Regions:
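Thiamine diphosphate
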Residues: 1-168
Length: 168
């Protein structure tokens, strides 16, 4: 089983049926599986804060949702997380494709990639690094369980060591 299928299976196990995302080639490995599965409703957002708003709206109607974005887009979404998801206690699993890490070719991605986890710490958002397929199922399921039990956003940071990164 691929790392992407492991994540999709965990989403289903936790009854997460709406996936809001901003397109990205690494995230596409997950969204292409989700798009073929009738269980899921896949929503492509134009900006990361829009994806978070979609997930918050889904939660308000009783539906579990997850968000997928790049670390650079996480920088765009901080106000939606700090001003909506955290104070409203909305459990949103945020899968962040970390750029600026191992093998990064684009210098513009480095600063936000390095800053993502410290920003998550400052906001008090629990986060877990997904950097290999070893124990991936355990990590993702444990994080999703905590997200919904604590009723707060939580980040799962996916590194190039997990998904292979980008070449161009």
């Amino acid at each position: 089983m691929t790392w992407a299928q492991t994540i999709v299976d965990a989403l289903k196990e936790h009854e997460i049926s709406l996936i809001a995302y901003v397109p990205d080639s690494s995230i596409h490995q997950v969204t292409k599986i989700v798009d073929k599965d009738e269980y899921f409703h896949l929503v492509s957002a134009t900006r990361e804060e829009e994806a978070l708003g979609i997930a918050a709206g889904a939660y308000a109607t009783g539906r579990n949702a997850a968000v997928f974005m790049q670390s650079s887009g996480f920088g765009n979404s901080i106000n939606a997380v700090a001003g909506l998801a955290i104070p409203s206690r909305i459990p949103i699993p945020i899968f962040i494709n970390l750029r600026g890490e191992h093998g990064e070719f684009n210098i513009a991605q480095v600063t936000m990639g390095r800053s993502t986890r410290p920003i998550l710490d400052v906001l008090g958002i629990p986060h877990y690094t997904l950097d290999s397929e070893e124990r991936l199922e355990e990590k993702v399921n444990g994080a999703l369980k905590l997200c919904y039990a604590s009723r707060e956003p939580l980040a799962l940071c996916m590194t190039p060591l997990l998904h292979g990164g980008k070449n161009v």
